[in-house]
């Protein structure tokens, strides 16, 4: 068991429940971690504005990974501006193809916050990701299913590369970071970390690579892992 010096945690489906409500158990556990001097990193497919609000609400100090690794941020670095790692033009070319193919009948609806996204394009999840992946197989773009949305991203970035870059920026030892997630877009993220945790509601692919699969779902699973591996309770 590695010594945990930081915790990186996903948001939707990990510290929130199936209705995207923040679990009090996760809030309490993450604040307990911060009070113990262990920084918490928020890692999500959401935009930086949303992520910053979550980080402020929880009280985390470890930095942020946003837009599935396309953006990273930490107060006091880069003149307090986000660092953009992903190339949104790749997603834009794929989206232009979809618009040309389907016109007004396009079956994929862009989420309202897309104008604020700087590294990817995001659709509401009104269908499985496989048809979209097939449509865009000839494009230099990755299709991620976050459980709540479908994301078109630069294949050169993911939550894992975002974690690596943030760790370099803040001088974290990535081998001592516990990563907690639930969905497909957390696979690379967990692989990058030192100790991998999947909450009970996680997809099978994530459970297969996890060092520990929680008995509890959502935020209760986050609290379970923190109590067990950080505080030995």
Predicted region positions:
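Non-catalytic pre-domain segments flanking phosphatase-related domains
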Residues: 1-9, 169-172, 176
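Asp-based phosphoryl-transfer active-site loop
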Residues: 3-20, 190
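Active-site phosphate-binding/coordination module
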Residues: 18-112
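Hydrophobic packing residues within well-ordered alpha-helices of enzyme cores
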Residues: 26, 51-55, 132, 206, ...
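Residue-level signal for inorganic ion chemistry
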Residues: 44, 68, 190, 211, ...
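Conserved acidic, metal-coordinating active-site core of Asp-based
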Residues: 95-193, 197, 201, 207-209
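Short acidic-hydrophobic, aromatic-tinged amphipathic segments that line or gate anion-handling sites
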Residues: 213-216
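Generic C-terminal helix-cap and adjacent flexible tail
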Residues: 228-233
